[in-house]
């Protein structure tokens, strides 16, 4: 896969289509909404309205192959030293091609650019994050997350997601 992102480029075998990871724009709200809604129906992500996505569009990156939307992810600041990876999702065309790792690398580079030393996620895809340099940690070390999102989650008292953390410093 040939990968092109802002300031990040990786090449592989010829003949494969290019994966482009870029900052999202308001034109991406509908495909973002549809993807997140599908994951939310499966209980994997929290749902987000089109209005919320429009307000938060600058937090998202989009992955495309051949000009077609194949995945997304976002970065949300929880404090001066911590950001959260949110909403990493792929459609069938993006799965099994390393696109999730490309999205995660783009988000990690943005955290580094902002000089934020820690990046976390609550996830069911623990192996994916472990392969990308994260470690499993206790959720309780993230009170910022608990008070911003978990307080509104229906699984608040029976959360089955696993907390992962990567230190960037």
Predicted regions and their residues:
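Short amphipathic alpha-helix that is part of the acyltransferase structural core
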Residues: 2-47, 64, 161-163, 168-169
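A short, internal acetyl-CoA/4′-phosphopantetheine-binding micro-motif in the GNAT/acyltransferase core
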Residues: 88-95, 124-125
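Conserved beta-strand in the GNAT
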Residues: 62, 68-77, 81-89
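Short active-site oxyanion
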Residues: 19-20, 113-119
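C-terminal "cap" of GNAT-fold acetyltransferases
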Residues: 2, 142-169
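A short helix-loop-beta-strand connector motif used in the catalytic cores of GNAT acetyltransferases and
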Residues: 51-66, 84, 157-160
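Conserved acetyl-CoA-binding loop-helix of GNAT-fold acetyltransferases
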Residues: 96-111, 121
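Conserved active-site alpha-helix within GNAT-family acetyltransferase domains
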Residues: 117, 123-150
